[in-house]
Structures are given as C-alpha cells and as structure tokens.
C-alpha cells in the first residue's frame, strides 16, 4: 500500500458539467443549499464513529504497552459486564485471545484491555494512561489531518484527558469512557483515516500520506508523498492483528469479502447513529502477503 488513492467516492454526487458555463453560479448555489449536501466530500470531510474497524488499532496498542500478549485471554459473557454496567456482544467462544477477538469482533475483549491499561499503576494516573493511548492513535493517523492533497480535510476527533476533565461532571474513570475501546463514544474518524489504518496494518508498520497526485512534470515525485510515516508500534505486533483480520474473512464477521484465490484480510464495523439507523463499515486489504490495495467503505 503506497498511499496512492485509486478511488475516492462520495455520495450523493452531482454532474460536474453544472459547474461550467454561464449558469455555474446559479447551479452551485442550488447544490450548496441541497439538504443532501452533494458538494460535501464525505470521504475526507465527514467524521464518523469508526466502530469495530477501530479494534485492530486497539490490539496493536495493548500489545505495545504490554497489557496483553498474543495468548492473553479475556472473558465475554455476551458482553462486557462490570459493576452493573454492560457493553453488549454476540455469542461466541469465551474466553478468547486477540486473534479470535478480531475474527469474531468481540466487544468485551477490547473493553477489558482498555480498562486494564487505564487502571495500570505504571502510568501514575488514569489521565497519563489515556494520553499514552491517544498518542499511539495520533501516530497512526487518527485525530489529525493526514495531509491528502485535497482541501477541507477533516481531522476527525480524539479526546484526551483534558477533554474528559472539562466535560464529565464529577470525574471519570475507565468504565465511564469504555466505549472508546470499540470505536464509539467520542471517537470520530474520516473514511480516509479508516482506509489509512488498513494500509498501515497491510504494510506491517508504516504508511504514506494518502495522495491523488503522484508526480508533477518537471518536478518529479513529490517527496512528502514518498516518505514513510512510522507509528509508535513495534512491527512484531502486527502479526496477530493481520491473522485476526484474515480469520474474519475466512470464517468471521466479513465472510462476504472472501474471494477465491486471493487472501483478503478485513474488519467490519457497526456504530450507533443518533440520527437514525446504525452505521456500517468495512475495511480490508489484499493479498495478505505482499499487499497491493487497502479499502474502506462507510
């Protein structure tokens, strides 16, 4: 995955011919006032809860911080249940480790993982632990503009400890914010950021700034698009995440992405939508080894 954008699709769309000729001003005004916002490029400007497409990033962070290993097991009793609080999940084997947790998209596994990280005394405080968690995500391209060569890119949103100190009355703890572990709560990402995470995993530890223009005549390849960006995660921790995403396609939550003769790796996502039906998402890359393409659909 080289960062080259092969397709960037947003819907609803409009006929670009409307923006040429003598009526272009009137046509643009009509498009701008359209309630469906056809001029709004949702692929880079909209920010949505990433849902379970966020879980691979959590698997990487929890390994990097020594909270889990490939064999660490957490229980799931149709969800994460603690002190009267519940985050639901579906039926599958329990307990389970990281690989099947990704394959089955287990909510409880990642809730337990984040809770154990935030409550770990090595960080000194929950605020410090949360900011370590957040900084890993920033290094992966979340919570900031990736730098695509198009205007008006959104940075999405990642909260930090200061945000919670200011917005949660009476204080906060791991249980208060546990939904961020599964890509909900305050977490927002653009579809491009989700695709970029997938490219990072496909490359096992690096990504390039997403771009439409590869080279300019007389200038050559643009350096900022040819420079590897390396997050804070050791490359050895990608192995289990890739295996879990491959398992999701073979016999997990995204079997429809299985293509005969091509080893596809993928991750589905569902996120609550306060405005209507739940959001659905998918990210994937192929082939598993020597990958050529990464995709995200929201």
Spans of model-derived segments:
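Beta-lactam-recognizing serine transpeptidase/beta-lactamase-like catalytic domain environment
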Residues: 1-53, 57-298
């Amino acid at each position: 995955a080289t960062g080259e954008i092969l397709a960037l699709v947003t819907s609803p769309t409009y006929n670009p011919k409307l923006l040429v000729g003598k009526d272009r001003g009137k046509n643009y005004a009509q498009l701008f006032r359209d309630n469906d916002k056809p001029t709004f490029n949702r692929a880079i400007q909209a920010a949505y809860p990433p849902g379970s497409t966020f879980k691979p990033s959590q698997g990487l962070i929890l390994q990097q911080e020594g909270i889990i290993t490939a064999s660490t097991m957490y229980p799931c009793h149709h969800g994460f249940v603690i002190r009267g609080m519940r985050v639901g999940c579906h039926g599958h084997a329990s307990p389970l480790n990281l690989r099947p947790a990704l394959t089955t998209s287990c909510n409880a596994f990642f809730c337990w993982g984040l809770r154990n990280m935030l409550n770990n005394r090595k960080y000194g405080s929950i605020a410090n632990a949360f900011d370590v968690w957040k900084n890993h995500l920033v290094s992966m391209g979340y919570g900031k503009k990736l730098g695509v060569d198009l205007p008006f890119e959104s940075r999405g949103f990642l909260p930090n400890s200061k945000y919670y100190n200011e917005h949660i009355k009476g204080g906060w703890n791991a249980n208060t914010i546990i939904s961020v572990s599964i890509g909900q709560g305050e977490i927002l990402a653009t579809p491009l950021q989700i695709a970029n995470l997938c490219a990072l995993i496909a490359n096992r530890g690096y990504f390039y700034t997403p771009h439409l223009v590869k080279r300019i005549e007389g200038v050559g390849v643009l350096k900022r698009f040819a420079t590897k960006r390396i997050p804070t995660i050791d490359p050895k921790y990608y192995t289990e995440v890739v295996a879990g995403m491959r398992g999701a396609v073979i016999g997990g939550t995204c079997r429809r992405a299985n293509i005969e003769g091509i080893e596809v790796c993928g991750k589905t996502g569902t996120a609550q939508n306060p405005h209507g039906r739940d959001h659905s998402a998918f990210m994937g890359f192929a082939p598993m080894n020597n990958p050529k393409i990464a995709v995200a659909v929201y």
